[in-house]
A protein has these predicted regions:
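Active-site "cap" helix and flanking loop/linker of ATP-utilizing ligase/carboxylase catalytic domains
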Residues: 15-36, 51-111
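Glycine-rich active-site loop/lid that clamps phosphate-bearing ligands
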Residues: 102-133
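Generic C-terminus detector
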Residues: 131-181
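Conserved hydrophobic "DFG−1" position in protein kinase catalytic cores
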Residues: 38-40
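Conserved protein kinase catalytic/activation segment
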Residues: 43-46
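Short, solvent-exposed beta-strand edge segments and adjacent coil->beta transition regions
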Residues: 2, 98, 145-149
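N-terminal low-complexity segments that are often proline-rich with Ser/Thr-Pro
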Residues: 7-15
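Glycine-rich phosphate-binding loop of ATP-grasp-fold ATP-dependent ligases
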Residues: 1-8, 59-62
Length: 181
C-alpha cells in the first residue's frame, strides 16, 4: 500500500558515513546540505542518488526524530548567516526506529480523507494527504500520485511494523472508483 523509508540507528552508521563522504567529494559538495540515498542489502551498499539539498518526502523530519539533528533549522540558519557549531549538535532522539510510509490508493474521485484517527495513535507524528476531497486521483505511475503519508517512530522494528499497519487502517479514506465507459 505504499513505499517506506526506515531509519534505524544501526551499527553500520560509521560505514555509511564513509561511503557518503566519498560520494559527495567527486560532485563538489563540501559545505551546506547534502542528500544521499543508499541501498543497503546485507554486506552490499550502493549509492542511488547524491545531491546538494535536503531530502524530500519528510526525510529531514524523520532524521530529526531518530537522530535528534534538526537539518531544516540548521540549513535555515546557514542560509541566513547565523549557523554556529552549537547548532550542529544533535538533540535527543525521540525513538531509535522511524519510518515515512507513503499511502497509495486506487484511482478515482476522492470522497473523504481524514487523518485524525491515525494522528491519535502514539508514535504517529504526522499524517497527511497530498490530494483533497473532490479531486480525481489518477493511476499510480510515479510518486506524484501518492495519496498521502505517515511519519512514525517506535522502539523497535516489530513495534514499528504493527504501528504502521494500525495507522494505515486508522486513516479514514473513501475513493469512488470510476469506471471508464
Amino acid at each position: 500500500m505504499g513505499n517506506s523509508l526506515r531509519v534505524s540507528l544501526l551499527p553500520f552508521k560509521v560505514g555509511v558515513k564513509a561511503i557518503t563522504t566519498l560520494r559527495f567529494c567527486p560532485v563538489g559538495i563540501e559545505t551546506g546540505p547534502s542528500y544521499v540515498q543508499l541501498r543497503v542489502d546485507g554486506d552490499e551498499t550502493g549509492v542511488i542518488e547524491v545531491g546538494a539539498r535536503l531530502g524530500g518526502g519528510k526525510d529531514a523530519e524523520l532524521a530529526k526524530l531518530v537522530t535528534g539533528f534538526d537539518a531544516i533549522r540548521a540549513e535555515t540558519l546557514r542560509a541566513l548567516g547565523g549557523l554556529t557549531p552549537a547548532h550542529l549538535e544533535p538533540g535527543e532522539p525521540v525513538a531509535p526506529v522511524g519510518q515515512v510510509r507513503f499511502v497509495v490508493a486506487p484511482p478515482g474521485r476522492i470522497v473523504r480523507l481524514n487523518a485524525v484517527p491515525a494522528l491519535e495513535l502514539d508514535g504517529v507524528h504526522e499524517a497527511g494527504f497530498y490530494w483533497r476531497e473532490g479531486m480525481v486521483l489518477p493511476p499510480m505511475t510515479s510518486g506524484a500520485e501518492r495519496l498521502g503519508y505517515l511519519l512514525l517512530t517506535a522502539s523497535g522494528e516489530a513495534e514499528l511494523d504493527g504501528l504502521t499497519d494500525h495507522a494505515l487502517h486508522a486513516l479514514d479514506v473513501e475513493i469512488a472508483v470510476e469506471t471508464l465507459v
